[in-house]
Amino acid sequence: MENYSGAVVNNKYVETKSCEYRLTNNEMPIKLQFPSYLEQKTVQIMGKCMKVDHAVIEYRNQVPFNAKGTVIVTIRDTRLSYEQAAQAAFTFPIACNVDLHYFSSSFFSLKDETPWEIVYKVEDSNVIDGTTFAQIKAKLKLSSAKHSTDIRFKPPTINILSKDYTEECVDFWSVEKPKPIRRMLNPGPNQGPYPISGHRPIMLQPGETWATRSSIGRSSSMRYTNNDRPSILDNTSASDADYPLRHLHKLPEASLDPGDSVSQSHSNAMSKREIEDIIETTISKCLISQRSNVNKAL
């Protein structure tokens, strides 16, 4: 950031000297001049913030008559990540003299470093890399305010100074404002995995059973505190309709015993000899019945 001798808040522009730049395929910065350190501290003591009202980029080519290529000028906000720092971009032919006017849409604090960065690069050019191809001059118009306010987007202004080119030869891109999305902090009573009834699953604590925790109509909370648990379990005046399974864990084991399991019960399996006798008896009865039917037919 170079020193600037003028006042911070006025109708004048903070101008840089017209500098020559070399052709490159990589992004290179264009010099910007912001208020001096003393002027920044003066505005900071006044408790104000600042914004760039207007930025002007004056491009004057220094290339041969038949030079080809596209110049890309990008305005970046260094307060954002590198992938999302680009705020606007211009593209125009390398031989086209043009003035680019861009209007800012955000405030910045003087406690931060210079928020803006303007870079350029050249693509698809027949000019040799490293050649001094243009003079570029940047101008900024700044203003201060007690606090930030909403700024409406204002489209850029493009002044083409070369007669062989029209506005169709210049393109402009600007970043879009993200749509506001509300983020919920705590879900309400009608949200979450149990939106209809509002009931929550029973959470058992150490020393508790499902029978002691089961109740009817308790939708606000299914958890007993350490102070409330003894009174609920031992209070004989509590309604049995509210806690129908309260004393279930106190029943004797015999009342809840379903009996022996299949593996413990006596096996009724038949021996191989018994099965063979049943089969032989069945076959004999079938043969006798068939012979009786034949004799009756004769």
Swiss-Prot record:
Binds to dimeric supercoiled plasmid DNA. It comes from the Viruses. GO terms for biological process: transport of virus in host, cell to cell. InterPro entries: Gemini_BL. Coiled coil: none annotated. GO terms for cellular component: host cell endoplasmic reticulum membrane; host cell plasma membrane; membrane. GO terms for molecular function: DNA binding. Transports viral genome to neighboring plant cells directly through plasmosdesmata, without any budding. The movement protein allows efficient cell to cell propagation, by bypassing the host cell wall barrier. Begomovirus genome is shuttled out of nucleus by Nuclear shuttle protein (NSP) and the movement protein transports the DNA-NSP complex to cell plasmodesmata and facilitates further movement across the cell wall. Pfam families: Gemini_BL1 (PF00845). This is Movement protein BC1. Phosphorylated. Signal peptide: none annotated. The keyword Aminoacyl-tRNA synthetase does not apply. Keywords: DNA-binding, Host cell membrane, Host endoplasmic reticulum, Host membrane, Host microsome, Membrane, Phosphoprotein, Transport, Viral movement protein. Belongs to the begomovirus movement protein BC1 family. It is a peripheral membrane protein. It is found in: Host cell membrane; Host microsome membrane; Host endoplasmic reticulum membrane.
